[in-house]
Amino acid sequence: MTSVRKAFAVVAGAAAVILTPATAHADPGHQVTYTVTTPNTLTATIQYMNSDPPSQAAYNADSSKYMNNVQAPISDGQPVVYTTTLANPNQWAIVTASGILHWPDSGNGPAAFHCEIAVDGQVVAKQDATSAVTCATRPW
């Protein structure tokens, strides 16, 4: 190869590297952990986002495609934990819990709940409430 051809090959190769768009690596998503506890003995209705909707409109049209709805026995502060992967947890991570006390085990009065959302191991939202609780990474 002549020196002109070598120089052209080097310049062409460098231009190809510079002009070729970088391959986008898909975000593998973030591990989202939802935790619900109560000091009471009850069956809780727990809902949590298990997959990212493509848009708010899609979520509004059929939230059951993206939310899990679970009836879970829970008591004595023992955590109920659900884990999923979300691409955009800042937009979509949410967990709600409500329940009815089992009388006489829990006495009278409203149920007390605590919820937390952790993203990649870091707690990003937590809330305490009576009767029903919601933890979310954004206002709903």
What do these predicted regions represent?
Residues 27-65:
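Short, surface-exposed binding/anchoring microloops in extracellular/periplasmic proteins
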Residues 59-87:
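Tryptophan-paired
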Residues 15-18, 26-30, 132, 137-140:
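Activation corresponds to long, low-complexity, non-globular regions
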Residues 56-59, 68, 121-126:
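Surface-exposed loop/edge segments in extracytoplasmic proteins
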Residues 3-11, 70-80, 127, 134-136:
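Generic detector of solvent-exposed, compositionally biased contiguous segments
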Residues 26-28, 40, 76, 87-89, ...:
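Solvent-exposed loop and beta-edge segments used for protein-protein assembly and interaction
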Residues 81-137:
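Extracytosolic low-complexity repeat regions of secreted or lipid-anchored proteins
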Residues 1-26:
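Secretory targeting and sorting signals
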